[in-house]
Amino acid sequence: MMTMTTMADGLEAQDSSKSAFMEFGQQSHSQQSSPSMAASHYPLHCLHSGSHHHHQHDSSPYSGSNSYNRSLPYSYVSHPHHSPYLPSYHSNASGTQTRLDATEQQKTTVIENGEIRFNGKGKKIRKPRTIYSSLQLQALNHRFQQTQYLALPERAELAASLGLTQTQVKIWFQNKRSKFKKLLKQGGNPHETDTLPGSIALSPRSPAIPPIWDVSASSKGVNMSANSYMPGYSHWYSSPHQDAMQR
């Protein structure tokens, strides 16, 4: 009986020591795992705190910019499509277009009302040359021989009598004066150019033109033979009657 009791006590002692050893092992394992958990928890906490701190730093420029915007004397517009330079550019473009339109209108006015006309490219276009009749040229030349310069009432009266505009009379007198001075410089006679084409009127200094044939004799009733028209050529021709007599 003593032997069985001793063996049972020995087994209990071994169990108690084994259980104590297991508890100690569990405690040591728990102590070893707790620092790793603490270490793992610390980086997470640091990461969380760092992210929170970083978030604060990220949000700080906005707050700083807001405070900076409040300190500026003008409002800062951060949108790229609403730049303050764009309205001025559009206003300048519209101003340039307005000036171009005004220039085109001015050119049109010059074309309609002015003496010197302009086309779309800005080049001068000469007005069509005025064609004067023989009667108008005769009256203008006669008036030019009297005076080379006309007053406004005289020019208006002459233009109305000839059916011309005052501008046409003015331009004709200007051209006539330039031709007159040019002929004087060359030493010619300016009055030789006063003859009118298709007109019988002659200048006083022009020599008399001899008549081609004299018709006064026929008007007086003087009989002229047919051979008198060709006196030197009658022997070239012979009549058929004379040819028969000679044969």
Swiss-Prot record:
Query: What does the record give as the DNA-binding region?
Result: 125-184
**Pfam family for this entry, one:** Homeodomain
Q: Which residues form a coiled coil?
A: none
What are the entry keywords? Developmental protein, DNA-binding, Homeobox, Nucleus
Question: What cellular component GO annotations does this protein have?
Answer: nucleus
Leader sequence segment: none
Q: Which SMART domains match?
A: HOX
Q: Where is this region: Disordered?
A: 22-66
**CDD domains reported in the protein's UniProt record:** homeodomain
- Where is the protein found, in the record's own terms? Nucleus
Q: Where is the composition biased (Low complexity)?
A: 26-49
Q: Which GO terms describe its biological process?
A: cell differentiation; embryonic skeletal system development; medial fin morphogenesis; neural tube formation; pectoral fin development; regulation of transcription by RNA polymerase II
User: InterPro entries under this entry?
Assistant: Distal-less_Homeobox_TF (IPR050460), HD (IPR001356), HD_metazoa (IPR020479), Homeobox_CS (IPR017970), Homeodomain-like_sf (IPR009057), HTH_motif (IPR000047)
PANTHER family noted in UniProt: HOMEOBOX PROTEIN (PTHR24327), HOMEOBOX PROTEIN DLX-6 (PTHR24327:SF26)
Q: Which family does it belong to?
A: Belongs to the distal-less homeobox family.
| Name by which UniProt lists this protein | Homeobox protein Dlx6a
Originating organism: Danio rerio (Zebrafish)
Underlying gene = dlx6a
